[in-house]
Amino acid sequence: TKGKSTTAYYVRSILNDWLTSEGKPPCAILSSIDNYDGVIAEESHITTPEVLELYQPFQNAYDSGISHLVMEVSSQALKVGRVRGMTFDVGAFLNIGTDHISPIEHPDLADSYASKLKLFDSCRVGCVNTDADHAAETVAHARSGGCELITFGSHASDTVFCERVEKRADGLYFTVRSPKYNGEFSITMPGLFNVSNALAAMAISMAL
């Protein structure tokens, strides 16, 4: 699915600004790009590590006094149970696509979608993109799993929503409305999907 890495780094940037202002260590991250846990900083070889590898960075982050960890969780990891037994403070469902349909990942879109929905079985707060395909079903599943629900998208009924987007020479400018902050934001990365990723990062940060 597209957007996990971008959203993870948006969240990390937001959290690090706050953590720095509080005099605290920067947050840890496990992503498809690189990993940092307060002890090890390295390029990633897999989006979500195997279960026996996964707990070492958690321990390293804890021992380093790190209070927050941002993590990409792949649909394949959810399918095979790499994060089974974990509880995430916040999880976000960005979108559903065909990019992971293959003989070694998901045989079809239904399997991919069902795997992704397992995220909400492990979340205290679930954030859902209402502009994505199957949004109503995703929202219903998050609610049925007992998650506190935060929605984000282009609808005024969303918890975090974007009123308008303007493309300028130096990036995309958009107005955001939410319970905790309202105002104009901008990103330099092109593509409307990155506005959606930014909204996801705001929703996640708002829940923390």
Model-derived segments and their meaning:
Residues 2-126, 130, 136-145, 206:
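Phosphate-binding loop of NTP-binding sites
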Residues 4, 134-135, 158, 194:
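Alpha-helix N-cap/loop-to-helix initiation residues
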Residues 105-113, 124-125, 140-208:
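Adenine nucleotide phosphate-binding catalytic loops in nucleotide-utilizing enzymes
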